């Protein structure tokens, strides 16, 4: 967790988040990032070449993104989860036809500064979508077949798209993430068995 105090008697404010940052966690992330940059630098024969610069740039960009996400209210992710998931599906479709191809796989979108891999973001996108979906429906509807159609599509669509890149490892992680969230939502095991046999 990014903050020292695990709970507040009121919702987190920006001030609360700033003054309760877990400095140990922040330092650990920065230290690992610096070590990885020096490891890349060393593997390049002591030359700060394209790969070293690219790695350093990605670390800085995603560390800033990490901070932005941490300071963003949870209500924002709750209200935009469906939209985020939809955009990620569009990006996966884009990758399938127009993505950057390397070593037999087509997984990346060229953003000129960096190559973005939507399948990695989809791991989070599936969790956001399903969490919000199950939050919106009543507990009694969780095990009804008609309410399970959306989660099944939301899990299988990105799974199939990522598998076709091909990227088996990421596809399996997306599938497992979806199954775990669905199980935590209260879906019975016999329904999992039914869909597995189907």
Regions found by a protein language model. Name each.
Residues 10-29:
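N-terminal membrane topogenic signal
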Residues 1, 17-19, 164:
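Intrinsic disorder/low-complexity signature
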Residues 26-198:
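Hydrophobic alpha-helical transmembrane segments of multi-pass inner membrane proteins, especially
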Residues 1-10:
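N-terminal Lys/Arg-rich, disordered targeting/topogenic segments
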């Amino acid at each position: 967790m990014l903050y020292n105090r695990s709970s507040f008697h009121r919702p987190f404010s920006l001030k609360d988040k700033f003054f309760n940052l877990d400095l140990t966690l922040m330092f650990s992330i920065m230290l690992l990032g610096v070590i990885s940059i020096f490891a890349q630098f060393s593997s390049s024969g002591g030359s700060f070449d394209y790969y070293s610069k690219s790695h350093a740039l990605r670390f800085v960009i995603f560390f800033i993104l990490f901070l932005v996400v941490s300071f963003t209210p949870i209500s924002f992710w709750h209200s935009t989860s469906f939209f985020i998931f939809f955009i990620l599906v569009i990006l996966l479709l884009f990758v399938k036809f127009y993505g950057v191809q390397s070593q037999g796989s087509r997984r990346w979108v060229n953003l000129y500064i960096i190559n973005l891999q939507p399948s990695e973001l989809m791991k989070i996108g599936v969790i956001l979508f399903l969490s919000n979906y199950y939050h919106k429906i009543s507990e009694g509807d969780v095990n009804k077949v008609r309410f399970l159609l959306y989660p099944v599509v939301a899990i299988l669509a990105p799974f199939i798209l990522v598998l076709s890149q091909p990227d088996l490892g990421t596809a399996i992680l997306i599938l497992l993430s979806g199954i775990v969230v669905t199980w935590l939502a209260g879906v019975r095991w016999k329904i999992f068995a039914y869909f597995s046999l189907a």
